[in-house]
């Protein structure tokens, strides 16, 4: 087996994501015929500091969401440079694309074009070496199965209802294995569905497979989840915890937080009080994007108030970007980063962000996007880096379930070497 294996072809095509929007899929072929394929996800509530997702803008085709320009960039500019390169040198591949793009936000080539190529190269390399993707990326120490952060009630941008906060999730941190954690979540999901039906609520699902009932308040969403956990036979706050993603940047207007569904307009301090009240009443272990991406003072307030009690995840705040994360670490805000590959655009930069977070004592939560495909890269990534937490939707809709099923396969492959850390995955909580 050679330590230099040439890339002989890089090509992209337009495929559909789970919201019926076009996205980029890339094939990378090696000199021995080995192929790697990756499809790129897309977000609905996107941070303003994210790398650029290149869309065509022609309203007559796919409502302007076509990605033919990104595909052309893969098939010409990127392919011309990468053909002949060593697929086993991921850093050189990603560095070459970053230099080809030449912008600070992937605005020329598009993060969707670059990420598709980056991941397809990694998959081709793993296939050539006869390794699982998590083994190739993480090496012999890749062994930690993640605690799922499972979205079971959708609101905000992910659903057409009057619930302001975007995601209400469950985390089975009290499970003893990943497969048990998944079973617990599935049982709570079914329990929740029957409860919602009994209460006369709609059980249609949102983009990520969670239910999207027209509840009266955000607190009612938490209450019905607690009820569903108990109905399924589990103890809230012992076996299963609650996580929230308010996606606060979406409700931040003129320096205040507008909870339209509840008829409230709150200052940053009042918003922190709102969360603190919920944390005191319910078994909440994690809040993501509790404050808006540009509300640094709000982030300081929430970190002072809750930063030793619960996990505070920065998504729009950090956008998987080491420059943004450095600012957060220096200012002492948040204690966790959400990792979304397409926010930054290459595997190398993603790994750098995870490493920086962990060195600073921040956890890293590997995440899907609301527009997903059958691609399961993030399941391998979360094990590769021993992150210990994954956010990839409800146990419904096959683009979500694909990731969970891949994790079951990895758990099976690791056998006794595999480790499910449960509450130990929250090393950022000091209480």
From Swiss-Prot:
**PANTHER family from the entry?**
ENOLASE (PTHR11902:SF1)
Any one biological process term the GO annotation gives: glycolytic process
**Role, per record:** Catalyzes the reversible conversion of 2-phosphoglycerate (2-PG) into phosphoenolpyruvate (PEP). It is essential for the degradation of carbohydrates via glycolysis.
Task: Reply yes or no: does the keyword Methyltransferase apply.
Answer: no
**Listed GO MF terms:** magnesium ion binding; phosphopyruvate hydratase activity
Q: A single Pfam family, by name?
A: Enolase_N
Major place of residence: cytoplasm
Q: Which residues bind (2R)-2-phosphoglycerate?
A: 166, 340, 369-370, 391
Keywords in UniProt for this one?
A: Cytoplasm, Glycolysis, Lyase, Magnesium, Metal-binding, Secreted
List the transmembrane segments. Answer: none
Matching CDD domains, A to Z? enolase
Q: One GO term of the cellular component aspect?
A: cell surface
Q: Which residues bind Mg(2+)?
A: 245, 288, 315
The scientific name of the source species is Clostridium tetani (strain Massachusetts / E88)
Query: What is the protein name for this chain?
Result: Enolase
Cofactor(s) for this protein? Mg(2+)
Q: Which family does it belong to?
A: Belongs to the enolase family.
**Alphabetical list of InterPro entries matching this protein:** Enolase (IPR000941), Enolase-like_C_sf (IPR036849), Enolase-like_N (IPR029017), Enolase_C (IPR020810), Enolase_CS (IPR020809), Enolase_N (IPR020811)
Which PROSITE patterns does this chain map to? ENOLASE (PS00164)
Q: In which pathway does it act?
A: Carbohydrate degradation; glycolysis; pyruvate from D-glyceraldehyde 3-phosphate: step 4/5
């Amino acid at each position: 087996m050679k330590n230099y294996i040439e890339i002989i072809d890089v090509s992209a095509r337009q495929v559909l994501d789970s919201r019926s929007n076009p996205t980029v899929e890339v094939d990378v072929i090696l000199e021995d015929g080995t192929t790697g394929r990756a499809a790129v996800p897309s977000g609905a509530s996107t941070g303003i500091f994210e790398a650029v997702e290149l869309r065509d803008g022609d309203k007559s085709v796919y409502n302007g969401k076509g990605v033919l320009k990104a595909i052309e960039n893969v098939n010409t500019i990127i392919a011309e440079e990468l053909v002949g390169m060593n697929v086993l040198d991921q850093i050189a591949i990603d560095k070459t694309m970053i230099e080809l793009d030449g912008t600070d936000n992937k605005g020329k080539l598009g993060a969707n074009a670059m990420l598709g190529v980056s991941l397809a190269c990694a998959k081709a390399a793993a296939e050539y070496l006869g390794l699982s993707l998590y083994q190739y990326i993480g090496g012999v120490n890749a062994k930690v199965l993640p605690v799922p952060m499972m979205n079971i009630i959708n609101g905000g941008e992910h659903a057409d209802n009057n619930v302001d906060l975007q995601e209400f999730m469950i985390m089975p941190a009290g499970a003893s294995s990943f497969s048990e954690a998944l079973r617990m979540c599935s049982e709570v999901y079914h329990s929740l569905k029957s409860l919602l039906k009994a209460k006369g609520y709609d059980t249609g699902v949102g983009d990520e497979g969670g239910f999207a009932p027209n509840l009266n308040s955000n607190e009612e969403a938490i209450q019905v989840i607690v009820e569903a956990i108990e109905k399924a036979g589990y103890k809230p706050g012992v076996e299963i915890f609650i996580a929230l993603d308010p996606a606060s940047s979406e409700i931040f207007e003129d320096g205040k937080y507008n909870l339209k569904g509840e008829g409230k307009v709150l200052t940053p301090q009042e918003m922190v009080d709102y969360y603190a009240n919920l944390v005191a009443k319910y078994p909440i272990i994690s809040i993501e994007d509790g404050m808006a991406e540009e509300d640094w003072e709000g982030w300081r307030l929430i970190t002072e108030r809750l930063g030793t009690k619960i996990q505070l995840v920065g998504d729009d705040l950090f956008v998987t970007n080491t420059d943004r994360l450095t600012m957060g670490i220096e200012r002492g805000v948040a204690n966790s980063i959400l990792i979304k590959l397409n926010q930054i655009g290459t595997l190398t930069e993603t790994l750098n962000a995870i490493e920086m977070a962990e060195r600073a004592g921040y956890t890293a939560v590997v995440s899907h996007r609301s527009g997903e495909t059958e691609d399961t890269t993030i399941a391998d990534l979360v094990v590769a880096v021993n992150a210990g937490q994954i956010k990839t939707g409800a146990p419904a809709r096959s683009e979500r379930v694909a990731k969970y099923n891949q994790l079951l396969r990895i758990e099976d492959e690791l056998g006794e070497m595999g480790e499910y850390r449960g509450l130990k995955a929250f090393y950022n909580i000091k209480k």
